[in-house]
Amino acid sequence: MTGSDLILTTALTVLGAVIGLIVRWRLATLAYRRDDEVTQPSPGPRWWVPAAVAAASGLLAWRFGVDRWPLLLPTLPLAWFGPWLSAIDLDVRRLPNRLLAAHGVVVAVGVGAAALITGDLSIAIQAAVGGMVAFVVFWILDRVRPGGLGWGDGKYIPIIGAAAWARCCF
C-alpha cells in the first residue's frame, strides 16, 4: 500500500462514516414506513449503520487503491446503500422501490463513468452480464423455494450483480 492508497482509504473511510451518520439520521425518521407499519415497535438506534458504511467504504478503497480508483465508482454505492437497505429490511421486511431505483441509477452511472474513464467497455459489459446472471440465479431460487426471497430482493440482486461484476476482470 502506497502513501496515496492510505490517503484514499482514510478519506473514503471518513466519507463513509459521514454518509453512515446521515443514513442513520434518515432511518431514525422512520419515513420509509407505510401507514400499516407505523405502529410497529421502534427498531432502535442502529449504531451499526455508520460503522458498516465506513468499514465497507474503507475496505473497497483499500482493495482497489489509487491505481484502480475508477472501479470504486460502481462499487462504493454498495457500501453506501447496502446498510441503509439492510436496516429497512430488518425493520419492515421490505425494500423501498424509490431507494432501490436511486441505488440502481447510481450504480449504472458509476459503471458508465468507470468504463469511460478507463476506456474499457468490458466494465459495462461485465456489469450487464453480472446483473443478468444474478437475476437469473434469483429467479431459479425463487422457483425452487417460493417465498424465500421477496421481489424487493429480486430488484436488488441485479444491482448487486452489476456492481460486483463491473470489476471482476479488471
What are these regions (language model features)?
Residues 1-170:
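A membrane-topology feature that recognizes alpha-helical transmembrane segments
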